[in-house]
Amino acid sequence: MSAEPAVALRVPARALSITEEDFCAWLGRAMPRQRIEYHRGSLLIDRSKPLSPFSDKDRRELSAIANRAFVLAREGWLCLVQKRHGDFDYSYIAIIAARPDPAQRAQR
């Protein structure tokens, strides 16, 4: 009797939600509190070379998008959230942070 794994790590190949170029274009025009889903799946799996269902080119593109989002979040420009849909299925969402204007910052 062979035991089947409870959950398979492999997910069906998906297309990228957005390219890095389109993500950067959105960043340039988005207003505070606007949001975009920059990936649907599992960043842990989809960025991992041995596990990813994506081609090397798409996997590198996804990593570039995720890295850019993380850096901008760390600098306070974005808020990053996840919405869980199921096992290994998440929406990764970037939200433009509301930032006080320079006059408000000077008053602090």
Q: Where do the language-model regions lie?
A:
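Short, amphipathic alpha-helical interaction segments positioned at domain boundaries
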Residues: 87-108
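Short amphipathic alpha-helical interaction segments
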Residues: 58-74
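Residues in well-ordered beta-strands of folded domains
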Residues: 39, 81, 95
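Short amphipathic alpha-helical interface segments
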Residues: 2-59
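A generic structural micro-environment signature
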Residues: 7, 44, 84-86, 100-102
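Short secondary-structure junctions
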Residues: 31-32, 73-75
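A short, conserved structural fragment
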Residues: 74-83
